[in-house]
């Protein structure tokens, strides 16, 4: 049995609160059970040097965990003087995932930065970050359109992510920390709304997994992501753009 009594295919309760802070063009607090991430989308004119003059935009991301988002305090990476490898890996994953959501040519020479700050961690912080950041990105793109700077939103598709894994020999969707830390296989799946996959990260922590188990986990992720896309759509229906 799972820690909270969920079915193997069931995702945690999801809450997506838009317009969470007032300054960012897009701001979302996303909650997957006890995992809580603040996702802000900031719009700036101009693009990185390697894109100048190409008539396209850029989407990038930064990720961090507050010192007491975990069971014991972790020093801020700024205090240590450098980002850890895990942090850099996750923020690159978030950026790659959200770039897939946008037609960068239609965005024009704007840069959108997605800042994902983990307030409370209980597993799945990177997948929650992608899911929440996509909603913040939609609001930021709509702000550019509302300001008359773009004729239409360059959004191509919603993007969401979920973790799956094998725990005690059972495939499970949306792992909590206690499940993640005990998983024989751990996988993160990033998907577009039409079912096409952007990224699959899978690791066998103990016994290697079979091809059939891989397909089973991907099917489990696809089912969970349908619920997550529903949560995104429901959030975007609420609260008129501020």
UniProtKB/Swiss-Prot annotation:
Keyword RNA-binding annotated: yes
KW tRNA processing (keyword) present: yes
GO MF terms held by the record: 3'-5'-RNA exonuclease activity; tRNA binding; tRNA nucleotidyltransferase activity
Entry superkingdom: Bacteria
UniProt-listed Pfam families: RNase_PH, RNase_PH_C
SUPFAM superfamilies, alphabetized: Ribonuclease PH domain 2-like, Ribosomal protein S5 domain 2-like
CDD domains assigned to the protein according to its UniProt record, in alphabetical order: RNase_PH_bact
Annotated residues for binding of phosphate: 86, 124-126
InterPro entries linked to this entry: ExoRNase_PH_dom1, ExoRNase_PH_dom2, ExoRNase_PH_dom2_sf, PNPase/RNase_PH_dom_sf, Ribosomal_Su5_D2-typ_SF, RNase_PH, RNase_PH_bac-type, RNase_PH_CS
Catalyzed reaction equations: tRNA(n+1) + phosphate = tRNA(n) + a ribonucleoside 5'-diphosphate
Function: Phosphorolytic 3'-5' exoribonuclease that plays an important role in tRNA 3'-end maturation. Removes nucleotide residues following the 3'-CCA terminus of tRNAs; can also add nucleotides to the ends of RNA molecules by using nucleoside diphosphates as substrates, but this may not be physiologically important. Probably plays a role in initiation of 16S rRNA degradation (leading to ribosome degradation) during starvation.
Annotated family: Belongs to the RNase PH family.
HAMAP family, sorted: RNase_PH
Record's protein name: Ribonuclease PH
Organism lineage: Bacteria, Pseudomonadati, Pseudomonadota, Gammaproteobacteria, Enterobacterales
């Amino acid at each position: 049995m799972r820690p909270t009594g969920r079915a193997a295919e069931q995702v945690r309760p999801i809450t997506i609160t838009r317009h969470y802070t007032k300054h960012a063009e897009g701001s979302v607090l996303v909650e997957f059970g006890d995992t809580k991430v603040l996702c802000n989308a900031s719009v700036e004119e101009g693009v990185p040097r390697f894109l100048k003059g190409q008539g396209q935009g850029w989407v990038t991301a930064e990720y961090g965990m507050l010192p007491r988002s975990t069971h014991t305090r972790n020093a801020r990476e700024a205090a240590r003087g450098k980002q850890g490898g895990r942090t850099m890996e996750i923020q690159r994953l978030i950026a790659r995932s959200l770039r897939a959501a946008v037609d960068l040519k239609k965005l024009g020479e704007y840069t959108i930065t997605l800042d994902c700050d983990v307030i409370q961690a209980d597993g799945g912080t990177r997948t929650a970050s992608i899911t929440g950041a996509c909603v913040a990105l939609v609001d930021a793109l709509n702000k550019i359109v509302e300001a008359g700077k773009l004729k239409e939103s360059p959004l191509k598709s919603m993007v969401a992510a979920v973790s799956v894994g094998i725990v005690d020999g059972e495939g499970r969707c949306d792992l909590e920390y206690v499940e993640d830390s005990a998983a024989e296989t751990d996988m993160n799946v990033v998907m577009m709304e039409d079912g096409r996959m952007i990224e699959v990260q899978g690791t066998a922590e103990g016994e290697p997994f079979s091809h059939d188990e891989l397909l089973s986990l991907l099917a489990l992720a696809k089912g969970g992501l349908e619920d997550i896309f529903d949560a995104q759509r429901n959030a975007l229906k609420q609260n008129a753009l501020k």
